[in-house]
Amino acid sequence: MKPLTNGDLFKSPTLIKISALVFVTVAFFYLGKHWSDDGYQQLVFFSSSTSGSSIPEVSVSPNSNRVFNLSAIIPTNHTQIEIPATIRQQPPSVVADTEKVKVEANPPPPPPPSPSPPPPPGPVKSFGIVDANGVMSDDFEVGEVESDTVEDWGNQTEIVEAKSDGDSKARVRIKKFGMCPESMREYIPCLDNTDVIKKLKSTERGERFERHCPEKGKGLNCLVPPPKGYRQPIPWPKSRDEVWFSNVPHTRLVEDKGGQNWISRDKNKFKFPGGGTQFIHGADQYLDQMSKMVSDITFGKHIRVAMDVGCGVASFGAYLLSRDVMTMSVAPKDVHENQIQFALERGVPAMAAAFATRRLLYPSQAFDLIHCSRCRINWTRDDGILLLEINRMLRAGGYFAWAAQPVYKHEPALEEQWTEMLNLTISLCWKLVKKEGYVAIWQKPFNNDCYLSREAGTKPPLCDESDDPDNVWYTNLKPCISRIPEKGYGGNVPLWPARLHTPPDRLQTIKFDSYIARKELFKAESKYWNEIIGGYVRALKWKKMKLRNVLDMRAGFGGFAAALNDHKLDCWVLSVVPVSGPNTLPVIYDRGLLGVMHDWCEPFDTYPRTYDFLHASGLFSIERKRCEMSTILLEMDRILRPGGRAYIRDSIDVMDEIQEITKAMGWHTSLRDTSEGPHASYRILTCEKRLLRA
């Protein structure tokens, strides 16, 4: 073999390959070093593995302590994602070091690693304020509204221009809505219309407590202000027992009912001991008594949806929540000053409603239990027409509990009232199941057999078969007994929680065009919202949001509320069924959820600052044909708490105008893509209401 010479060595292919590999390695090492020092701020990773149900998620490089210049890599039209505060903040020292690196073209070799920092201090085991004696005290209050959520707004409405689009009517563009007068801070438009109330021909049947909405063009056109000193509400479950005085600054209820263990004032808070007029020793003891009286009253199983009439501060409903029962607490506005407002501030479901001359806005066979404790209603007046309304809303086989003086006192006048009540319930075919102490409990029949077997001419009569017991919008009370469906629909719902996802029988009675099987449509809606809420929980950290009072403004079958329940979010949802669509309220109640009928072209029957979260899916693209979108949005602003959020999921066609109006209301908004991507016809507008001050 011929030995290699020096020239042959340099011509060897092996050496050429080794040299090339070394050169490439050095080059990549230099480029990697240059990229690491000069462009590190550009590193951010967006998850591309989004499922069909989730919205875009943000994941951050493990080296998240470095500073990112997000605006340099995200296009202006990209879906905006909330970035954690730890990433948004840029300490001055870090910024200065970064700029220094950019200026130096040839940085010196890195210094040797510094010694590791000392370990972080242990977790804080106590937190408080040191008093004058040097002793730490935890007796201090936290709850002021954060400064970055407060804005000086003024009280003048700013109009920019008036324009007309062809043949359409002229539209006034509002740059900024002004603040309403302080006197309107608890304004409920349809219940505070004094001009109309003064003109009523009669008020003896409670007509003044019913809806009397402002005429078209005279509705709300300003932002309802909060009371002075308004604070972020105390979160649930602590709010069940105490709320800020400054949020509901009224003491009349304390003066009237303080001795009955309803409510008391302690410095800057109202406290709720849990008592009531007929259960001074507490609601829990009272509920235990009811369960012992009737074995079938199993809260959280047979009894899932209840109504408390003349609810006071809603302690009955508040304590039923811990037993997995949703209670709609109702009372007229201002019978005892602001009792419904107290209930809502506590985080308990409630609405202003009155038994007067019209049907309440709930469907037939809605409630498993209806409760009245000293509710100041004469059930036997006008041949029992008010108890007939209770009968309409009470589920077949459901219970009516009456705690009142005629049940247990033996004065002649009270005994006469008891006899009248007993005779009326017999004519309704109700069965007196138990009378014990000051409580009497009746049960409604499961079918019409008893009604049909009564003697001819017995009053009250059965309603005509043409009567729709679910027609409730501005419908007068009827002096007749609502029929129970012949097939038992509404009376044979499963136990909770199975009823939440079981397609109810009354699904077949809903009047709407269905191109697929209704049960499949029901299940598809539940799956749709379950996946979307799952995406919100993962990407937008919904479990960290302070959600308690939630309003779904276009509820369908109640899939949104069911999904919140499935994902264990500690909130309650009122599902609204608009009058402009099919009446799905019976289905919502058969599932064990709360709902109400409403027309969003009119104001809602609740106090200002009621809800933490408003959800509107497909609402504006439908209702804009009937009324101005600003009408709906101003009402949303009235009932949303400062710091509360609204998610508007709707067509691209309406988003520009919605954004314009929300900006004029002082809301902070962000437009996002849906899970279908940037080319879908729908968008999600996430909104946050700020605390505005004049």
Curated annotation (Swiss-Prot):
InterPro entries: Put_SAM_MeTrfase (IPR004159), SAM-dependent_MTases_sf (IPR029063). Its main location: Golgi. It is found in: Golgi apparatus membrane. It is a single-pass type II membrane protein. Residues 83-128 are annotated as: Disordered. Keywords: Glycoprotein, Golgi apparatus, Membrane, Methyltransferase, Signal-anchor, Transferase, Transmembrane, Transmembrane helix. GO terms for biological process: methylation. This is Probable methyltransferase PMT11. It comes from Arabidopsis thaliana. The lineage of its organism: Eukaryota, Viridiplantae, Streptophyta, Embryophyta, Tracheophyta.
